[in-house]
Amino acid sequence: MQIFDTHTHLNVEEFAGKEQEELDLAKEMGVVAHNIVGFDKPTIERAMELTGQHPELYLTLGWHPTEAGDYSPEVEAYLLEQLKHPKVVALGEIGLDYHWMTAPKDIQEKVFRRQIQLSKELDLPFVVHTRDALEDTYAIIKSEGVGPRGGIMHSFSGSLEEAKRFMDLGMMISFSGVVTFKKATDVQEAAAGLPLDKILVETDAPYLAPVPKRGRENKTGYTRYVVDFIAGLRGLTTEEVAQATYDNARKVFGLD
């Protein structure tokens, strides 16, 4: 069985010195490929270090909406240089975060739009973070347009109808441990109802640990629980969902 964790943060302080232990556990649970997401300079640099040490790791680099206030021509030049790395598979995570509101909405929108444009110029898919901002996120993606490489709605927390709207724009829908939460019925309906070739799985580790590990530090190996849960929702085997989402990840990341 092969599982691809399409969004994890092995590059943050919580995992410092424990990366090999995390990857060993992941392998035991069938998680054989990992997309490490760098969202500011320290996490970008650590992600690049890790991918140089572990062949099963891939890179997504971008400027997170909570850091949008720091975006500048110098930051963009830095990003463009790092995005030349041969293991880069996407640009992100980018988007809107109205929960923390560390930057005004207009600044977040400007930085989001600019990075969508960059992803198309670089022929990369883009990975979207949206929190308390789903309608504005949709409007911006619709107006900017999705390039031929597509994009990913990371840790999707909306309904089936909302997911279909993003899918119709050319986006893949990625499910994290949120789908396993008891009250996340809308997300569960989306995971059950979308075409299997349009979904991905992730952990967003160390955040959002799935049931039965909810409330603890998340681990990239716990993608297995997300796969198990979605398989149950869809009446499929774990192996079927694992292989389908693995193949979907390789396709969107241009690894085939």
What are these regions (language model features)?
Residues 1-256:
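Mid-domain alpha/beta scaffold segments of enzyme catalytic cores
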